[in-house]
């Protein structure tokens, strides 16, 4: 049952069922619809019924107002419909009684004219509610189907519903005739059972009198041509009311759906507005924090600029000095390498001269020995010749002394800490072994003394020795160049490390200065009452301490 309209429609059906009973009893005791057997139902009050909105909880005010409005309109329509139905029922009953009286009057007049010549008549029932032709009144009931005769037999067999009194013989004859002919004829499609029957029966008013045709109770009235017409104006009205109710219900559901959608959207918008307000508050707090951070960064930037103004100039000066020292070291080492090459070439030339002069010097020595053995007096005369050999030995000694001086100069040269890879080390590969020249010269002299004719072999050996020495010198030069390149890379790396350390030191200085200022500010804020206390000697300014730290770091890097 519909929770909204169910109770009202149920009352409406009760009103429709119970309307015929009280009205028929008040007007003459007859009933509609062929005299039904249902008991009369009490009429519902004509005022508006109590309206209870569906749903477990209280409805919103808009929906409650809409439902109350619709309920009041429905109750007004029900009241009007009930009054109109009562009026129509009274009109139909009066028309029926008027026609019944006219029929009785007409039958009485015909009875006076015909006298006793009239034929015997039987009860006749007519079904209404369709437009198909009706069988004539003269047709015997025995020729009718059983389906058509049975409803009228039931109606005629109820003596309480007949205003003319009991008719037991005619009812018995009708039932016997209908049962005897029910097997002969089948029900016709045109005579379908209806809801309302109007019947007329012939009764005898007294012994020996003509039978009188009397119209029974019912809602139908018969045209002069014998066609029954049903007057039903209530059902279309009820259908129209149902249509109106359905339309109102659809509109109510549509309004309810729209209201629920709007209510949901409003709730969502309220939630969204609350979220946006919270986000706006959080954004304001973040903005304030960022503003404080910006102020702090500005203060730190001012401090950093003040510290960097002096540090940059000092750092640039130190970098320039370092670059100049590196260039000077590279130039000095190139000059030393060139001098070493010149000395080695000069020594090679001296060795070649000694090699070719050794045989003559050996012959002179033998002659000198023979002369000394022969006469000791000749040794004094040989004395002035010794300076020639002494001059040669003095040249060799001078070359050796120059080489030794160059090596000592290399050892005594003060290299930087980051250029240790370029320091000269006298190893087996780098040390110039000048004894090889003299040993080779002595071996060549002995070989020449033994084989004086093999001069060509000596020349070849000398050339091979030159090639070997040249190769060794070239390898030494390549090694020195490699060490120079390595030293340059090391110097660049150390320079970058030094710059990174300087940047780290600057950052630490900035942080220390910031912390010092914050501590000073916090101390000033916390103890404003102790400003009058006499202070001790002021500490040295931070710039001097920082300068001393920078000098120490620069000295360590230079070392």
Swiss-Prot record:
Indicate the segments forming the IF rod domain, all copies: 73-526
Tissue specificity, per the record, is:
Ubiquitously expressed.
Q: Where are the stretches annotated XCCR4 binding. Required for localization to the double-strand breaks (DSBs)?
A: 450-525
**Residues annotated as region Disordered?**
21-57, 158-187, 360-394, 520-559
Residues annotated as region LMNA binding?
A: 65-116
Organism classification: Eukaryota, Metazoa, Chordata, Craniata, Vertebrata
Gene name of the record: IFFO1
Task: Mark out the compositionally biased spans (Pro residues).
Answer: 39-57
* UniProt feature coiled coil, ranges: 85-117, 237-301, 455-501
Q: Where in the cell is it found?
A: Nucleus; Nucleus, Nucleoplasm; Nucleus inner membrane; Nucleus matrix
Q: What is this protein called?
A: Non-homologous end joining factor IFFO1
């Amino acid at each position: 049952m519909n929770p909204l309209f169910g109770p009202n429609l149920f009352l409406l059906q009760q009103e429709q069922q119970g309307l015929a009973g009280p009205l028929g009893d008040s007007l003459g005791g007859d009933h509609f619809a062929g005299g039904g057997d249902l008991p009369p139902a009490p009429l519902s009050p004509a005022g508006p019924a109590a309206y209870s909105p569906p749903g477990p909880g209280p409805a919103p005010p808009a929906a409650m107002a809409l439902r109350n409005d619709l309920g009041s309109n429905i109750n007004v329509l029900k009241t009007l419909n009930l009054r109109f139905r009562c009026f129509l029922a009274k009109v139909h009953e009066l028309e029926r009684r008027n026609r019944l009286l006219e029929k009785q009057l007409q039958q009485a007049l015909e009875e006076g004219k015909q006298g006793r010549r009239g034929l015997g008549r039987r009860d006749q029932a007519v079904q209404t509610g369709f437009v198909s032709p009706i069988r004539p009144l003269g047709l015997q009931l025995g020729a009718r189907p059983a389906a058509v005769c049975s409803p009228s037999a039931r109606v005629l067999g109820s003596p309480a519903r007949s205003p003319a009194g009991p008719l037991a013989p005619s009812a018995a004859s009708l039932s016997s005739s209908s049962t005897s002919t029910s097997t002969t004829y089948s029900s016709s499609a045109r005579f379908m059972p209806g809801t309302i029957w109007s019947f007329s029966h012939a009764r005898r008013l007294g012994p020996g009198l003509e039978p009188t045709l009397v119209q029974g109770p019912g809602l139908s009235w018969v045209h002069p041509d014998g066609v029954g017409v049903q007057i039903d104006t209530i059902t279309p009205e009820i259908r129209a009311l149902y249509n109106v109710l359905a339309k109102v219900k659809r509109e109510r559901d549509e309004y309810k759906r729209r209201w629920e959608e709007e209510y949901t959207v409003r709730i969502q918008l309220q939630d969204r507005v609350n979220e946006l307000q919270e986000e706006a508050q959080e954004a304001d707090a973040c903005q304030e924090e960022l503003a404080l951070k910006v102020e702090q960064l500005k203060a730190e930037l001012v401090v950093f600029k003040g510290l960097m103004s002096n540090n940059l100039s000092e750092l640039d000066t130190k970098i320039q000095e370092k670059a100049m020292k590196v260039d000077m070291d590279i130039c000095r080492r190139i000059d030393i390498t060139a001098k070493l090459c010149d000395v080695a070439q000069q020594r090679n030339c001296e060795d070649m001269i000694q090699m070719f002069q050794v045989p003559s010097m050996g012959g002179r020595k033998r002659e000198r020995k023979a002369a000394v053995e022969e006469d000791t007096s000749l040794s004094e005369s040989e004395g002035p010749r010794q300076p020639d050999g002494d001059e040669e030995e003095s040249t060799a000694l001078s070359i050796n002394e120059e080489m030794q001086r160059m090596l000592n100069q290399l050892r005594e040269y003060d290299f930087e800490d980051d250029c240790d890879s370029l320091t000269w080390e006298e190893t087996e590969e780098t040390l110039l072994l000048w004894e090889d020249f003299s040993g080779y010269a002595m071996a060549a002299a002995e070989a020449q003394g033994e084989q004086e004719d093999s001069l060509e072999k000596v020349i070849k050996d000398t050339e091979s020795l030159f090639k070997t020495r040249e190769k060794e010198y070239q390898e030494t030069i390549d090694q020195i160049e490699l060490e120079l390149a390595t030293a340059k890379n090391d110097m660049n790396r150390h320079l970058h490390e030094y710059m990174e350390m300087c940047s780290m030191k600057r950052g630490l200085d900035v942080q220390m200065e910031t912390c010092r200022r914050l501590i000073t500010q916090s101390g000033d804020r916390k103890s404003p009452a102790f400003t009058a206390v006499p202070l001790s000697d002021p500490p040295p300014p931070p710039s001097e301490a920082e300068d001393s730290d920078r000098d120490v770091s620069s000295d360590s890097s230079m070392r």
